[in-house]
Amino acid sequence: MGLEKSFILFSLLVLVLGCVQPSLVGESKESPSEKFKRRHMDEEGPYQSSPTYCNQMMKDRGMTSGRCKPLNTFVHESWAKVKAICSQDKVTCKNGKSNCHKSISTLNITDCLLMGSSKYPKCDYSTTARQKHSIIACDGNPYVPVHYDATV
């Protein structure tokens, strides 16, 4: 009887730990698609191109922590429109992989380029608003954007 109770209690403990542990670890983990959204999506977008837009956005989105990210592009379109690129023209990515897609239409974007004399921790960026085609890498199930590859 004592052995049965021990087995039942052990089984319950394993069950509880199995349920609790993944949620503790998983909550702070960012999926590739969530990382793409954080780094590249700004649906609201700048209504007017402000010279400080990139400095503020790069800082707010955590891309100047520990180093200055040299280049980043923000897309000012709906998530649905950006996700739809994953079913558009397939092209080869810069790294040679075949999971990139080129947008059929131009997108409203802002390119942030680290200025040459800028050094961490003071990351200064030039801000350039454009309408260009974008090349986006997609992955997963569902097939969603995971990497901004290029502007063309």
From Swiss-Prot:
<dbReference type="GO" id="GO:0016829">
    <property type="term" value="F:lyase activity"/>
</dbReference>
<feature type="binding site">
    <location>
        <position position="94"/>
    </location>
    <ligand>
        <name>substrate</name>
    </ligand>
</feature>
<feature type="binding site">
    <location>
        <begin position="69"/>
        <end position="73"/>
    </location>
    <ligand>
        <name>substrate</name>
    </ligand>
</feature>
<dbReference type="InterPro" id="IPR036816">
    <property type="entry name" value="RNaseA-like_dom_sf"/>
</dbReference>
<feature type="region of interest" description="Disordered">
    <location>
        <begin position="26"/>
        <end position="48"/>
    </location>
</feature>
<keyword id="KW-0964">Secreted</keyword>
<protein>
    <recommendedName>
        <fullName>Ribonuclease pancreatic gamma-type</fullName>
        <ecNumber>4.6.1.18</ecNumber>
    </recommendedName>
</protein>
<feature type="active site" description="Proton donor">
    <location>
        <position position="147"/>
    </location>
</feature>
<feature type="disulfide bond">
    <location>
        <begin position="68"/>
        <end position="123"/>
    </location>
</feature>
<feature type="disulfide bond">
    <location>
        <begin position="93"/>
        <end position="100"/>
    </location>
</feature>
<dbReference type="GO" id="GO:0003676">
    <property type="term" value="F:nucleic acid binding"/>
</dbReference>
<comment type="function">
    <text>Endonuclease that catalyzes the cleavage of RNA on the 3' side of pyrimidine nucleotides. Acts on single-stranded and double-stranded RNA.</text>
</comment>
<dbReference type="InterPro" id="IPR023411">
    <property type="entry name" value="RNaseA_AS"/>
</dbReference>
<feature type="binding site">
    <location>
        <position position="38"/>
    </location>
    <ligand>
        <name>substrate</name>
    </ligand>
</feature>
<feature type="active site" description="Proton acceptor">
    <location>
        <position position="40"/>
    </location>
</feature>
<comment type="subunit">
    <text>Monomer.</text>
</comment>
<feature type="disulfide bond">
    <location>
        <begin position="86"/>
        <end position="138"/>
    </location>
</feature>
<keyword id="KW-1015">Disulfide bond</keyword>
<keyword id="KW-0732">Signal</keyword>
<dbReference type="Pfam" id="PF00074">
    <property type="entry name" value="RnaseA"/>
</dbReference>
<keyword id="KW-0540">Nuclease</keyword>
<dbReference type="GO" id="GO:0050830">
    <property type="term" value="P:defense response to Gram-positive bacterium"/>
</dbReference>
<dbReference type="GO" id="GO:0005576">
    <property type="term" value="C:extracellular region"/>
</dbReference>
<dbReference type="GO" id="GO:0004522">
    <property type="term" value="F:ribonuclease A activity"/>
</dbReference>
<dbReference type="InterPro" id="IPR001427">
    <property type="entry name" value="RNaseA"/>
</dbReference>
<keyword id="KW-0378">Hydrolase</keyword>
<dbReference type="InterPro" id="IPR023412">
    <property type="entry name" value="RNaseA_domain"/>
</dbReference>
<feature type="disulfide bond">
    <location>
        <begin position="54"/>
        <end position="112"/>
    </location>
</feature>
<comment type="similarity">
    <text>Belongs to the pancreatic ribonuclease family.</text>
</comment>
<feature type="binding site">
    <location>
        <position position="35"/>
    </location>
    <ligand>
        <name>substrate</name>
    </ligand>
</feature>
<feature type="compositionally biased region" description="Basic and acidic residues">
    <location>
        <begin position="27"/>
        <end position="43"/>
    </location>
</feature>
<keyword id="KW-0255">Endonuclease</keyword>
<feature type="signal peptide">
    <location>
        <begin position="1"/>
        <end position="25"/>
    </location>
</feature>
<keyword id="KW-0456">Lyase</keyword>
